[in-house]
Amino acid sequence: MQICLIDETGTGDGALSVLAARWGLEHDEDNLMALVLTPEHLELRKRDEPKLGGIFVDFVGGAMAHRRKFGGGRGEAVAKAVGIKGDYLPDVVDATAGLGRDAFVLASVGCRVRMLERNPVVAALLDDGLARGYADAEIGGWLQERLQLIHASSLTALTDITPRPQVVYLDPMFPHKQKSALVKKEMRVFQSLVGPDLDADGLLEPARLLATKRVVVKRPDYAPPLANVATPNAVVTKGHRFDIYAGTPV
């Protein structure tokens, strides 16, 4: 995959070249999307819209730390949707990991989560965020146990992941209407890189065959059900719903 690669670390140690080789990235000076290694982290920038800033994965500080400490925990909609109850903490495959937010929330309340991400740039961002998270004194211990990244296409990986999870979670890219600055900024940069999930409808059936208990699909409230398969079961929040489908028991 081609992207503009920029090293702002000033160390000259070739770390960016190693990273590019690992994820199969080729430097393209004219690409509007840039993957930038800063002294702090790896980030994605849209070069023709510098005001949008850089997008990076941060499990330790910022919004994710606030959500972990002051969010709803088990009361969050995603936790309810996957079926967390009492001692039951399902094993989850997040087949559309993105920036890992929902996966992190589930891991923070005790679930083991395997994140699938097919885009090599997004996978590199997730891997960078995980490395910093694993090294953190406060969350590193449980994060290493509960949150993992698998760089693979969901459409193929969903048929051969072992062991089978109890829950498969899907949050395919869907055009957003929200006006919130953060969503607009992230979605604009993100969609410039990966585009809409045009094959997302094809995820539902393999997900249902893989999950032993249920499949949860996050949708904007205005979006039709995935693959146009309606379900009466959903957790509804302001702006979103989490559609719930039966899996395939062992």
UniProtKB/Swiss-Prot annotation:
High-level lineage: Bacteria, Pseudomonadati, Pseudomonadota, Gammaproteobacteria, Enterobacterales
PANTHER family in UniProt: RIBOSOMAL RNA SMALL SUBUNIT METHYLTRANSFERASE J
UniProt KW Cytoplasm keyword: yes
InterPro entries assigned: 16SrRNA_methylTrfase_J (IPR007536), SAM-dependent_MTases_sf (IPR029063)
The protein, known as: Ribosomal RNA small subunit methyltransferase J
Main localization, broad class: cytoplasm
Binding site for S-adenosyl-L-methionine: 101-102, 117-118, 153-154, 171
The protein's role, per its UniProt record: Specifically methylates the guanosine in position 1516 of 16S rRNA.
Gene name tied to this protein: rsmJ
